[in-house]
């Protein structure tokens, strides 16, 4: 990166400024000093884009699943399909699990397409296990599905659903790791912990760039599962607006 190149240039300049008499040893010319670079993660050709691409994959998975699932359920509600289902003896929990199962299959398929396209066509390097990459992206997709279904209950039109994007999706761009937040206050950075994409971004970065395994990503996986569980419960409660039992 540009920062690494500047640091290397500064070190080279320091070596060149060493007085000649300090480079002498017992009257003989000392061997020329050399600087060897070793990269903990990545290599000399790695760029900032390589660093954020794992997070971008998670972001695209979240964004498309959130938008499609929210609008799909909204259409069923505005066209009366949901009301006809609620008129039956089916429980609210069964309705929610049915929607999650149906749209979940579509979300998983969409996630597989995004991940495999990124890895095999865009040639994104994966240092760790691809199975962890798939699992993390499937979890963020299911979290986006549950959040999208919940948010759609507050929208009365597709336009209103789109208006939720700045509230739900855009903040995650800032707090997921796509934009460095090292210089901001700690309390502002802490806001990012309420967004699922932050945990997905951390886990994907650990697997795809650092090659780490379960012992480094288990906490992020647990948090993503909690997001899915919490918003599934909120969806069941949210259907009380349309039916009390």
Predicted regions and their residues:
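Hydrophobic alpha-helical transmembrane segments of multi-pass membrane transport proteins
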Residues: 42-120, 172
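Juxtamembrane loop-helix boundary motifs flanking transmembrane segments in multi-pass membrane proteins
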Residues: 37, 41, 45, 73, ...
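Sterically constrained small-residue positions within well-ordered secondary structures
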Residues: 26-28, 75, 230
């Amino acid at each position: 990166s540009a920062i690494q190149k500047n640091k290397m240039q500064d070190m080279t300049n320091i070596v060149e400024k060493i007085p000649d008499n300090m480079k002498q040893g017992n009257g003989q010319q000392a061997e020329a000093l050399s600087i060897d670079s070793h990269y903990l993660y990545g290599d000399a050709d790695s760029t900032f884009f390589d660093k954020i691409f794992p997070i971008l994959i998670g972001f695209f998975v979240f964004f498309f699943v959130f938008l499609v699932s929210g609008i799909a359920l909204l259409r069923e509600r505005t066209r009366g399909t949901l009301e006809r289902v609620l008129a039956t003896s089916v429980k609210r929990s069964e309705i929610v699990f049915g929607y999650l199962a149906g749209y979940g299959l579509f979300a998983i398929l969409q996630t597989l397409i995004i991940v495999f396209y990124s890895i095999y066509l865009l040639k994104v390097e994966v240092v760790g296990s691809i199975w962890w990459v798939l699992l993390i992206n499937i979890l963020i997709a299911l979290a986006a599905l549950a959040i999208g279904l919940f948010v759609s209950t507050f929208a009365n039109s597709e336009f209103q659903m789109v208006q939720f994007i700045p509230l739900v999706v855009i903040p995650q761009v800032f707090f997921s790791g796509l934009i460095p937040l090292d210089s901001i206050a700690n309390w502002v950075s802490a806001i990012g912990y309420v967004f699922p994409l932050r945990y997905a971004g951390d886990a994907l970065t650990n697997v795809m760039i650092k090659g780490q395994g379960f012992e480094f990503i288990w906490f992020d996986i647990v948090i993503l599962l909690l997001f899915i569980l919490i918003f599934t419960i909120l969806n069941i409660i949210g259907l009380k607006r349309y039916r009390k039992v």
